[in-house]
Structures are given as C-alpha cells and as structure tokens.
Amino acid sequence: MSDPTFRQVRLGEALKRLRERAGLSQREAAYRLRYNYQKLSRIENGQLPEYHGMRAMLDLYGVLVSEEAPYIEMWERASEKGWWHPYGIENHGYISLEHDAVRVSAFSLGYIPGLLQTESYMRAVFQGWQVQRSRKWIENQVAVRVRRQERLASGLQYHAIIAEAAFPQADREQLLHINDAGQRANVSVQVLPNAAGLNDGFNGSFLLLDFAYPGDMTVLYVEHPAGAAHVEDVEQVKASRLVFKHLSKLALAPDESAEWIGRLAAER
C-alpha cells in the first residue's frame, strides 16, 4: 500500500481533532462506528475512509450539517489524484503541498525559485544534476513546473527572498521574468544582497506553506541531497517563520529589488 498523501493525512488529523473534541477515545469511537480499533487508527493516520464512513464520523462527533462542507471538501480532494501524476515525476510530496497552499514564503540560497524560473533556466538546472536524466524526464519536469506557475495567476500569495548568490547563472531573460512576476499584486520578490553579511540564510533554502483547512496550519518544507522533509511541529515552524521575517528585513525592499535585478539585466 502506498504512503498516504498530504491531503489524506490532513483529513485524518481533522477527524481525530473532531473525535477528541467530542470527548471520545479512539476505542469508544471505533465501537460506536462498528469499526475495529485498528481501522480507525489507520484512518486517523491518513488512510482514506469511505464517503459514508466519513459522514458517519461527522455525525458521531457532533458536526452540524451546516458545518460539514469543509470536511466533505477535504474528503473529495483527498480522493483525487493530482494532475501531476501522469508525468511520473519525483516531487517528494511538495507539489501536493503547493497545490493546496494559499500562501508560500520561499527563501532560496542557490537557485531562482521554481515558480519564478523560465523554461531555459529549468532545463539548465535539471541538466546540471549529478544524476543524468533522459530528455523525456527533463521535459516532463519542465512541463510540470510551468503548470505549477499557473498558481501565481490564480492568486496564490507568494513571497520570495532570493540570495544574491543565486543570480550569477541567471541570464537576461530570467532576470526580466522575475521582475515581470513581481509586478503581480500577489507576488513579492526581495533580493538578499551579499552586503547583508553572515545571516541565518546561509543554513539553506526553505519554504513555509500556509493552508486554509479547518484548523489553519503552516508546513515547513526543506529539500536536501537525499530527498526532502516537511515539518509541522509548531515550535520549529514558528522559529523558521521568525528566520524568514529576519531575512526579509535584511533584504532589499521589493521596489529596490526590482531595480537591482533590472540593473543586472541591463549588464547581460
């Protein structure tokens, strides 16, 4: 059996919170639902319940009919396969996170962030990886990344802080593309110049993703050479948000950043 998706885990956690709010132990709830204890445990850990089973849980946990809609929507979304699956790409679960997020805050140390990349920059990144990939694999990655960028047009709140170290490999087209994206009302781009000195950003790139599920939450996402990790621990997320705010203060303001990028583009 495959691992549960992020959406399925979110649904399981939401159902667990409802059960606890109703004052029921897992065993008590399982008995009243005519489930065995292990089945309810698996559901709360991300196994997708049947629709009628989920409705029975909402009823048992005292959720009013007028309050059911967000949970039904969560179930419907957890039942879907993401549009990216046919491309057969390795995304470490990030695309499903980004797809559902209402706000993304990204700090990038060495690359232009994916949502701001041109197709030629994307290809250069993938071709530069240690593991050589086929042309088809690269083109699938590019196609998915281009489609991901549609989120910017659909209103995703996006704040990118890009370290100066990420710019030497960016050509004129890429630089102008960043400034074009930054003109959107929902997009904010800041450059963290080398003049800012040593700072927390040297610890590496990271993203913070905010969601509008019942029980608003934030996820910290970090990629590393062996894969990626997403962190939901409240204290770790809080610490990472403070780091992001600090980097934002050190970085050039959005209008100053656009001027800085524009000057760099004029030199290329």
Q: Can you describe what each PLM-predicted range is?
A:
Residues 1-81:
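Basic, Lys/Arg-rich alpha-helical nucleic-acid-recognition elements, primarily the DNA-binding modules
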Residues 8-11, 25-30, 83-85, 94, ...:
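Short hydrophobic/aromatic-rich motifs at helix boundaries and adjacent loops
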Residues 31-33, 91, 259-260:
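Short secondary-structure junction/hinge motifs that connect adjacent elements
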Residues 44, 98, 223:
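Acidic-residue sensor for enzyme active/binding pockets
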Residues 50-51, 62, 87-90, 209, ...:
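Short, structured secondary-structure boundary patches
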Residues 54, 92-97, 263-264:
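Short alpha-helical linear motifs
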Residues 69-103:
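Short, charged recognition helix plus adjacent turn
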Residues 103, 107-268:
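Hydrophobic protein-protein interaction segments
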